[in-house]
Swiss-Prot record:
InterPro entries: Gemini_C4. Pathogenicity determinant. May act as a suppressor of RNA-mediated gene silencing, also known as post-transcriptional gene silencing (PTGS), a mechanism of plant viral defense that limits the accumulation of viral RNAs. The keyword Cell cycle does not apply. This is Protein AC4. It comes from African cassava mosaic virus (isolate Nigerian) (ACMV). GO terms for biological process: symbiont-mediated suppression of host innate immune response. It holds the Pfam family Gemini_C4.
Amino acid sequence: MPFGDNYIMSPINRRRCSRVSPVECLQLTWSKCELLVLEFKPRMSFSHTQIVLYPKNTCCHSFKHYLSHQTLSSLKSVESCIRMGNLTCMPSSNSRERSRLRTIVSSIVYTQAVAPISTPTFKVPNQAQMSSPIWIRTETPSNGDNFRSMDDLLEAVNNQRMMLTPKRLTAAVSQKLLM
C-alpha cells in the first residue's frame, strides 16, 4: 500500500488502521471525536501519515509527551502549525473555527494521499561531460563573413577536449624539447 502505516492513537489504546488511506482515516476519526492531531513526516515525504486521536474534552496539554520538543517550541498557534505541515490540531471549542480547520486538514490529507511517492533525483554530469560542449551555436551573417565551416567547428570541439592540464603541458613541453 503506498501510504505506509497509519495509526489511530488514544491515551488508552493504539491500534493500526490497516489498509485505510489517510483520507478514510480522517473521515473515520471525525465520527468518533472532536480533537484530531495529524502528524506528518517532513514536507517532501508522502509515504507515511500518523493520525493521533483523542476523545472529546481532552486538553491540548495532555498530549505533550507525544510530540517532540522541537515541534512544541515552534508551535505558536493552530494555524501556524497547519502551515508548517508537521502538525495539525483541531480544538473542539468553537464549531465555526473547527469546521474551517477541518476543511484545511482535509485538503492537507488529500494532498498527502494523492501526491506521487517518488522523490526528485538530480543527475550530475561527470567532469569529462562538462568540459566538452554538446552543441556549439554559430551565427552566420547575411553577407557570409565570419562563417565557420564544419571542419572549423570540429577542430574547435577537439581543441576544447584536448585542453592542457598541468600534467599534459609538462609532457608536451618535454616532448618538444626532446625533438
